[in-house]
């Protein structure tokens, strides 16, 4: 695309709104030391909020997981 073909976007409010709404997806973990359940987002430190232990296990899903045997 050449420079002459580039047009400045006119709807900057919609573009700015998309970047400011970051998804705050949190994952559920279980502490390996004290077995407390906690949720961590992407920017949180990987550390238990109760005891400070650094080993966290990912919690199992509530959905039915079924595999076919051969």
Curated annotation (Swiss-Prot):
<keyword id="KW-0539">Nucleus</keyword>
<dbReference type="GO" id="GO:0006361">
    <property type="term" value="P:transcription initiation at RNA polymerase I promoter"/>
</dbReference>
<dbReference type="GO" id="GO:0042790">
    <property type="term" value="P:nucleolar large rRNA transcription by RNA polymerase I"/>
</dbReference>
<dbReference type="GO" id="GO:0005634">
    <property type="term" value="C:nucleus"/>
</dbReference>
<keyword id="KW-0576">Peroxisome</keyword>
<keyword id="KW-0690">Ribosome biogenesis</keyword>
<keyword id="KW-0804">Transcription</keyword>
<dbReference type="InterPro" id="IPR029040">
    <property type="entry name" value="RPABC4/Spt4"/>
</dbReference>
<dbReference type="GO" id="GO:0003899">
    <property type="term" value="F:DNA-directed RNA polymerase activity"/>
</dbReference>
<dbReference type="GO" id="GO:0042797">
    <property type="term" value="P:tRNA transcription by RNA polymerase III"/>
</dbReference>
<protein>
    <recommendedName>
        <fullName>DNA-directed RNA polymerases I, II, and III subunit RPABC4</fullName>
    </recommendedName>
</protein>
<dbReference type="GO" id="GO:0005736">
    <property type="term" value="C:RNA polymerase I complex"/>
</dbReference>
<dbReference type="GO" id="GO:0005666">
    <property type="term" value="C:RNA polymerase III complex"/>
</dbReference>
<dbReference type="Pfam" id="PF03604">
    <property type="entry name" value="Zn_ribbon_RPAB4"/>
</dbReference>
<feature type="binding site">
    <location>
        <position position="31"/>
    </location>
    <ligand>
        <name>Zn(2+)</name>
    </ligand>
</feature>
<comment type="similarity">
    <text>Belongs to the archaeal Rpo12/eukaryotic RPC10 RNA polymerase subunit family.</text>
</comment>
<dbReference type="GO" id="GO:0005665">
    <property type="term" value="C:RNA polymerase II, core complex"/>
</dbReference>
<feature type="binding site">
    <location>
        <position position="48"/>
    </location>
    <ligand>
        <name>Zn(2+)</name>
    </ligand>
</feature>
<dbReference type="GO" id="GO:0008270">
    <property type="term" value="F:zinc ion binding"/>
</dbReference>
<dbReference type="GO" id="GO:0006386">
    <property type="term" value="P:termination of RNA polymerase III transcription"/>
</dbReference>
<dbReference type="GO" id="GO:0006383">
    <property type="term" value="P:transcription by RNA polymerase III"/>
</dbReference>
<dbReference type="GO" id="GO:0006366">
    <property type="term" value="P:transcription by RNA polymerase II"/>
</dbReference>
<dbReference type="InterPro" id="IPR039747">
    <property type="entry name" value="RPABC4"/>
</dbReference>
<dbReference type="GO" id="GO:0005737">
    <property type="term" value="C:cytoplasm"/>
</dbReference>
<dbReference type="InterPro" id="IPR006591">
    <property type="entry name" value="RNAP_P/RPABC4"/>
</dbReference>
<feature type="zinc finger region" description="C4-type">
    <location>
        <begin position="31"/>
        <end position="51"/>
    </location>
</feature>
<dbReference type="GO" id="GO:0006384">
    <property type="term" value="P:transcription initiation at RNA polymerase III promoter"/>
</dbReference>
<feature type="binding site">
    <location>
        <position position="34"/>
    </location>
    <ligand>
        <name>Zn(2+)</name>
    </ligand>
</feature>
<dbReference type="GO" id="GO:0006368">
    <property type="term" value="P:transcription elongation by RNA polymerase II"/>
</dbReference>
<dbReference type="GO" id="GO:0001172">
    <property type="term" value="P:RNA-templated transcription"/>
</dbReference>
<feature type="binding site">
    <location>
        <position position="51"/>
    </location>
    <ligand>
        <name>Zn(2+)</name>
    </ligand>
</feature>
<keyword id="KW-0240">DNA-directed RNA polymerase</keyword>
<dbReference type="GO" id="GO:0003677">
    <property type="term" value="F:DNA binding"/>
</dbReference>
<comment type="subunit">
    <text>Component of the RNA polymerase I (Pol I), RNA polymerase II (Pol II) and RNA polymerase III (Pol III) complexes. Component of the RNA polymerase I (Pol I) complex consisting of 14 subunits: RPA135, RPA190, RPC40, RPA14, RPB5, RPO26, RPA43, RPB8, RPA12, RPB10, RPC19, RPC10, RPA49 and RPA34. The complex is composed of a horseshoe-shaped core containing ten subunits (RPA135, RPA190, RPB5, RPO26, RPB8, RPB10, RPC10, RPA12, RPC19 and RPC40) where RPA135 and RPA190 form the DNA-binding cleft.</text>
</comment>
<keyword id="KW-0863">Zinc-finger</keyword>
<dbReference type="GO" id="GO:0006362">
    <property type="term" value="P:transcription elongation by RNA polymerase I"/>
</dbReference>
<comment type="function">
    <text>DNA-dependent RNA polymerases catalyze the transcription of DNA into RNA using the four ribonucleoside triphosphates as substrates. Common component of RNA polymerases I, II and III which synthesize ribosomal RNA precursors, mRNA precursors and many functional non-coding RNAs, and a small RNAs, such as 5S rRNA and tRNAs, respectively. RNA polymerases are composed of mobile elements that move relative to each other. In Pol II, the core element with the central large cleft comprises RPB3, RBP10, RPB11, RPB12 and regions of RPB1 and RPB2 forming the active center.</text>
</comment>
<keyword id="KW-0479">Metal-binding</keyword>
<dbReference type="GO" id="GO:0005730">
    <property type="term" value="C:nucleolus"/>
</dbReference>
<dbReference type="GO" id="GO:0005777">
    <property type="term" value="C:peroxisome"/>
</dbReference>
<dbReference type="GO" id="GO:0005654">
    <property type="term" value="C:nucleoplasm"/>
</dbReference>
<keyword id="KW-0862">Zinc</keyword>
């Amino acid at each position: 695309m050449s420079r002459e073909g580039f047009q400045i976007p006119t709807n900057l409010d919609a573009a700015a709104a998309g970047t400011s709404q970051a998804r705050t997806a949190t994952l559920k973990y279980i502490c390996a030391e004290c077995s407390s359940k906690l949720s961590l987002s992407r920017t949180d430190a990987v550390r238990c909020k109760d005891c400070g232990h650094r080993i966290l296990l990912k919690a199992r899903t509530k959905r039915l997981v079924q595999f076919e045997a051969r």
